[in-house]
Structure formats: C-alpha cells, structure tokens
C-alpha cells in the first residue's frame, strides 16, 4: 500500500454550544489539515496522485468554503448579529469541533474522487482530531 499526505493551512473562527470551557466563546484558530491518500498501486507516472491535483481541488475548496469564515452550529444565537454585520458564516448541523471538521473535509475529498483514507485536523499545534473512512 502506498500513501501520500497533503498538508493544507487555513484560518477560521468558531465557538461550541453546550460547552463549559473557553471554546464556548467566539475565537479563532490557525488550522492545519493533513489529508492521507492511498493506493495499492502507482499510476503510469509512478504516483498515488499528483499533489498539484489535490492542492487545486481541496485547497481551492477549503479557501472558498472555510478559510477566514466563522463556523457555527446552525442553532447558534449569534448568527443574526453576525449576519447583520455581513460577517462570513458557515453553519453546520453539529458543533464545529475538530472531529466534525475532519469528517467534513474527508467527505468532500471522497466526493471529488480522491482516494482519501484519513484526515487529521490540527486545531492547535498540539491538538488534532482524526477521521478515517
């Protein structure tokens, strides 16, 4: 089995509902995402996949869908205020935890036909969540 990893960085804000710690307040993170792609064999170029293809599609989607956006649970009471300020918001069915965001990125990569096997979502330099399909 061959495996390659593409690393992507972006910034986002969020807060967690029904949470007692500091993350119940609006705050931001500098995220790092590691996307593992695997194959039993290599293509005619000797690659699992071209890193540039992964960058164009996945970095492009992350830049447009998540980067410098406020990621919030769709029931968050702060949404109307942020909308009135024309802040960029992405609403999710669940709390925007590292676990949920890892799964979201995994699912998008899979939907684009990439042979993704694992996504690691680093919320801080010392804390990450992993989602495997």
What does each of the following model-derived ranges do?
Residues 1-133:
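Charge-rich, low-complexity N-terminal segments
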């Amino acid at each position: 089995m061959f495996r390659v990893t593409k690393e992507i960085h972006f910034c986002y804000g969020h807060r967690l509902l029904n949470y007692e710690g500091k993350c119940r307040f609006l705050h931001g993170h500098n995220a790092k995402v590691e996307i593992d792609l695997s194959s039993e064999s290599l293509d005619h170029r000797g690659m699992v996949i071209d890193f540039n293809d992964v960058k164009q599609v996945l970095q492009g989607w992350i830049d447009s869908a998540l980067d410098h956006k406020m990621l919030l649970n769709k029931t968050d009471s702060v949404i109307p205020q942020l909308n009135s300020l024309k802040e960029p918001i992405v609403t999710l069915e669940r709390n925007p935890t590292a676990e949920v965001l890892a799964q979201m990125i995994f699912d998008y990569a899979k939907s684009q036909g990439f042979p993704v096997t694992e996504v690691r979502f680093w919320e801080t330099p010392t804390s990450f969540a992993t989602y495997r399909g």
